[in-house]
């Protein structure tokens, strides 16, 4: 499936706000890819599709994951905000015919991160975090760091997320904190 067809499908499937966000993530991802030597085409495509499953119901996401035979931990399985990454990685392959494992992996881990992320995973995680429509404490600091040092920006984003989760008394996935400790 070509990018124009994917965008048309996303425009139908996603809310206007989510579609605009995906466009912003794609633009941010391309800029980061050019700055840090990643493939801009991969970054563009991964940026566009990273939230392709975001607005599905938890039950629909679970069905996609189950039908595909993917195993995820219990916390992901029961968390709509996080399960859209794995479900989206499946849709990338099954709906959008994207067979590139780096793109699929970048979509899978864009909400949680993981230790030893490859360059495209880092770029999509960070592009989603610093997208133009994001407005939260430290986002401008992270945007500036992203222009200078990808790993430093990533670490600041991880720490910001972990601190927010702790303040809200919410569960933090072990591989998110492991990635930050790396």
Please identify what each model-predicted range represents.
Residues 8-12, 32-156:
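Divalent metal-dependent catalytic cores for phosphoryl transfer on phosphate-bearing substrates
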Residues 171-173:
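Flexible, glycine/charged-enriched surface loops at secondary-structure junctions
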Residues 1-2, 166, 177:
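Non-catalytic interface/linker regions that flank or bridge core catalytic/transmembrane domains
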Residues 175-182:
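Conserved small/polar residues in nucleotide/adenosyl-binding loops
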């Amino acid at each position: 499936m070509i990018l124009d067809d994917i965008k048309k499908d996303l425009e139908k499937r996603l809310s206007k706000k989510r579609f605009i966000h995906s466009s912003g993530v794609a633009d941010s991802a391309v800029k980061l890819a050019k700055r840090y030597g990643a493939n801009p085409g991969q970054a563009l495509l991964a940026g566009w599709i990273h939230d392709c499953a975001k607005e599905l119901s938890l039950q629909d996401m679970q069905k996609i994951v189950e039908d595909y035979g993917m195993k995820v931990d219990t916390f992901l399985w029961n968390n709509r905000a996080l399960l859209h990454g794995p479900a989206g990685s499946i849709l990338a392959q099954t709906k959008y015919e994207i067979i590139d494992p780096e793109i699929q992996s970048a979509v899978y881990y864009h909400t949680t991160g993981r230790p030893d992320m490859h360059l495209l995973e880092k770029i999509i995680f960070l592009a989603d975090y610093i997208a133009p429509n994001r407005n939260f404490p430290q986002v401008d600091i992270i945007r500036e760091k992203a222009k200078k040092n990808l790993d430093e920006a990533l670490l600041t984003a991880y720490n910001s997320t972990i601190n927010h989760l702790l303040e809200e008394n919410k569960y933090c996935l072990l591989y998110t904190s492991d990635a930050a400790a790396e």
